[in-house]
Amino acid sequence: MLVPPDMLVAQTRMIYQMNRYCAERVQARMFKTSTAIREICKIVQDILKEVELQEPRFISSLVECNGRFEGVEVISPNEFEIVLYLNQMGVFNFVDDGTLPGCAVLKLSDGRKRSMSLWVEFITASGYLSSRKIRSRFQTLVAQACDKSMYRDMVKIIGDTTEVKLRIRERYVVQITPAFKCSGIWPRSAAHWPMPHIPWPHPNIVAEVKTEGFDLLSKDSAAMQNKNNNAASMEGDAWVLSFYEAENRLLQGGCRRRCLSMLKTLRDRHLELPGSPISAYHLKNLLLYECEKHPRDYEWDESCIADRINGIFLQLISCLQYRRCPHYFLPSLDMFKGKSPSALEQAAKQVWRLTREMLTNANAFEKL
């Protein structure tokens, strides 16, 4: 197919702008983030070493591999989550019956005695391994470790939450989340994935993702807000499903990872709004939906990135206006749950302003 010369010129100019944006803005963000991660991980490693001395069941899994720390997720420029993987989930059955959107419970296997579990004192009368009880014990240990740490003058534990959150150097907030890795199984609540009749992802990648599995995190879930006491109690024992590794595997190939880096940079520069209605994780999920809409690798060539970003922001505007953002693997889970309607409304206006600038100004990326 012949392409008009003026279209080729416009496309070439856009690719140049995008490359320059990546070289300047995106790389600057990545450098700043990696510097922050290195700084906080050195401190958290020291604290977790002390925790392990006090309680050997909490073995630190925060290690550096090929120049990067495994299990660290960037929530925003100054907020991070570190996952601490626990051992010996084996005597429990994984149960996700849809009662708690985005969550599952771990129930003592039939015929297994409590004493066979490494986590015996955290098992409820009903035989569930309580996420909240483990987190409470871990929080106490971390608080004690902070008092003993050589970094105690620059680390404070944030006390108004059931989660383990540290404030480091009055600049960073770091959440440390106990978790179990669930390999070789796939949750029933995500059984619909991948969608039939969509050629992405390739069956080999689907098999890889399902074999890799998912994580169960000990953290609060917005899905259970305003529930009755019984449901709230059950939610305290439940574990939050996380597909962090699966998502990263799916974004390999083409310029998908590059697209995500640009989305995160645009978010940090223009969508850091009161009430934090839009996170990098919202954008990551919408990027996965965009991959389904555009399943071919050539649709993720560098010449197409601007179109993909515009498509994702138009999706985001729609989600903000309808006040619902379905999780990619768990569509019944609304990721806007708990966000104020006014914050979502203001965010929709700001995203539209940003999108309109990108759609109407051929040189938009020079000043974004």
Swiss-Prot record:
InterPro entries: Mab-21-like_nuc_Trfase, Mab-21_HhH/H2TH-like, MAB21L/cGLR. Belongs to the mab-21 family. PANTHER family: CELL FATE DETERMINING PROTEIN MAB21-RELATED, PROTEIN MAB-21-RELATED. It comes from Drosophila pseudoobscura pseudoobscura (Fruit fly). It comes from the Eukaryota. It holds the Pfam family Mab-21_C. This is Protein mab-21-like.
